[in-house]
């Protein structure tokens, strides 16, 4: 019998598959006593456990033959209608996906070939980098910070390159927590429209704003201008539950058709029971739920910022988010976030080093903190521990 060589059997794309750094780090943070700022996990106290149990039983009792059957790839019609009303589009423009991660995977399959240029912020969402990398593209990056991407740098890149699409997170970006101001959104969109480019706008955190009102999305601004080139990705993970894996994409019919066809080859459709459950949970009291979600995250963000102001040495810089789930931290040049991570684990606190959020490398002195899963007391104690680790690292310089 000839020995089997798995590496010979794998396709070229398998060589591009990399483990999620966050998923691997989460394994290290599971030991007892660890306070974790690592995973971008929503606050578990917001999960509607009792309501979900009652709604699931009701769906199975009254519509079980529908919930347990195959369904159209585009999604459960009442949920598509709900999304359409929420976002301000027509139901036929909506595709329900199995989480936003699937939407990113579908976008990569539809738009990218090996060597295709695709533009991302640096840093950007690690899951998007992971999804797009499967297609073997060429990553173009522009610096991003507390007020979104550097538009002067973006303009310079667009003078010499024509990316297949720009992947952007204008509202409460993962990992920086940055919020692109309205004038910058308009300038960015003007650059895109002048060149006839596609934008993939990931708006998973759209409702997690701490101020009085939500800024209009690039998608909304483009629609007002009559421009069809923005593909809009949204999710129920942050406002309801990530475990249900229900999200959506909104796009021009020509683009949506290709995404639907790609989804047919991936999983046929998002689980019908999950779609029906999301619709049942949100068809009443949605506004009240969003207000509670915003209040919880606002209080947690305030708790983290108060603790950071108290515990973190002045040489260390960090963002002050206006929404979302993350604080982005920058150590003095020459210091390593991975070195800090090892010290932090000794103090029983964890975070995510920033390097993996940079598609083309860099960011060795950066890190992401999530305030979503711990309560205010846990946040304060976790930051105390992080402060000790930081002071220990800085003492070596």
Curated annotation (Swiss-Prot):
Chemical reaction(s) catalysed: L-2-aminoadipate + 2-oxoglutarate = 2-oxoadipate + L-glutamate
Top EC class, one word: transferase
Family of this protein: Belongs to the class-I pyridoxal-phosphate-dependent aminotransferase family.
Its job: Catalyzes the transfer of an amino group between 2-oxoadipate (2-OA) and glutamate (Glu) to yield alpha-aminodipate (AAA). It can also transaminate glutamate, leucine, and aromatic amino acids. It also contributes in the biosynthesis of other amino acids such as leucine.
Enzyme Commission number, as recorded: 2.6.1.39
Modified residues (N6-(pyridoxal phosphate)lysine): 263
Assembly and binders: Homodimer.
GO BP: lysine biosynthetic process via aminoadipic acid
Naturally occurring in which organism (per UniProt): Thermus thermophilus (strain ATCC BAA-163 / DSM 7039 / HB27)
UniProt-annotated binding residues for pyridoxal 5'-phosphate: 70, 100-101, 174, 202-205, 235-237, 245
Annotated effect of mutating residue 20 to E: Strongly decreases the affinity for AAA and Glu. A mild decrease of affinity is observed for 2-oxoglutarate. Increases the affinity for leucine and 2-oxoisocaproate
Pathway: Amino-acid biosynthesis; L-lysine biosynthesis via AAA pathway; L-alpha-aminoadipate from 2-oxoglutarate: step 5/5
Binding site for substrate: 40, 174, 368
GO terms of molecular function: 2-aminoadipate transaminase activity; pyridoxal phosphate binding
Record has Transmembrane helix as a keyword: no
Note: Catalysis proceeds by a classical ping-pong bi-bi reaction mechanism.
Keywords assigned by UniProt, alphabetized: Aminotransferase, Pyridoxal phosphate, Transferase
Record carries keyword Transferase: yes
Annotated site, Recognizes the side-chain carboxyl group of acidic compounds, chain positions: 23
Database matches in PANTHER family: AMINOTRANSFERASE, KYNURENINE_ALPHA-AMINOADIPATE AMINOTRANSFERASE, MITOCHONDRIAL
Protein name: 2-aminoadipate transaminase
Cofactor (UniProt): pyridoxal 5'-phosphate
Entry coiled-coil feature ranges: none
């Amino acid at each position: 019998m000839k020995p089997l060589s798995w590496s010979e059997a794998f396709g070229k794309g398998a060589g591009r598959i990399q483990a999620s750094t966050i998923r691997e780090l989460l394994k290290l943070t599971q030991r007892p006593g660890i306070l974790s700022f690592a995973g971008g996990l929503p606050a578990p106290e917001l999960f509607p456990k009792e309501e979900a149990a009652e709604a699931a039983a009701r769906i199975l009792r009254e519509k079980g033959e529908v919930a347990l059957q195959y369904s159209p790839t585009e999604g459960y019609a009442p949920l598509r209608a709900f999304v359409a009303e929420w976002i301000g589009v027509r139901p036929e423009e909506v595709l329900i996906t199995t989480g936003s991660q699937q939407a990113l995977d579908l976008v990569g399959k539809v738009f990218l070939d090996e060597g295709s240029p695709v533009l991302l912020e640096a840093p950007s969402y690690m899951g998007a980098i992971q999804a797009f990398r499967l297609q073997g593209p060429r990553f173009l990056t522009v610096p991003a910070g507390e007020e979104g991407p550097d538009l002067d740098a973006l303009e310079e890149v667009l003078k010499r390159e024509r990316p297949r699409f720009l992947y952007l997170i204008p509202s409460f970006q993962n990992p920086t927590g940055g919020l692109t101001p309205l004038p910058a959104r308009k300038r960015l969109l003007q650059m895109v429209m002048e060149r006839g480019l596609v934008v993939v706008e990931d708006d998973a955190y759209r409702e997690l704003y701490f101020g009085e009102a939500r800024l209009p999305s690039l998608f909304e601004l483009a629609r007002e201008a009559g421009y069809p080139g923005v593909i809009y990705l949204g999710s129920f993970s942050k406002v309801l539950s990530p475990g249900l894996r229900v999200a959506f994409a909104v796009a021009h019919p020509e683009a949506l058709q290709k995404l639907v066809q790609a989804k047919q080859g991936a999983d046929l459709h998002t689980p019908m029971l999950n779609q029906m459950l999301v619709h049942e949970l949100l068809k009443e009291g949605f506004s009240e739920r969003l207000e509670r979600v915003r209040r919880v995250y606002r209080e947690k963000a305030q708790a983290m910022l108060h603790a950071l102001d108290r515990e973190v040495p002045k040489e260390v810089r960090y963002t002050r988010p206006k929404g979302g789930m993350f604080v982005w931290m920058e150590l003095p040049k020459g210091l390593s976030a991975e070195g800090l991570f090892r010290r932090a684990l000794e103090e029983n606190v964890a975070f995510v080093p920033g390097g993996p959020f940079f598609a083309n490398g860099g960011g060795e002195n950066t890190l992401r903190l999530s305030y979503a899963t711990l309560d205010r007391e846990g946040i304060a104690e976790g930051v105390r521990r992080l402060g000790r680790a930081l002071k220990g690292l800085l003492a070596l310089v």
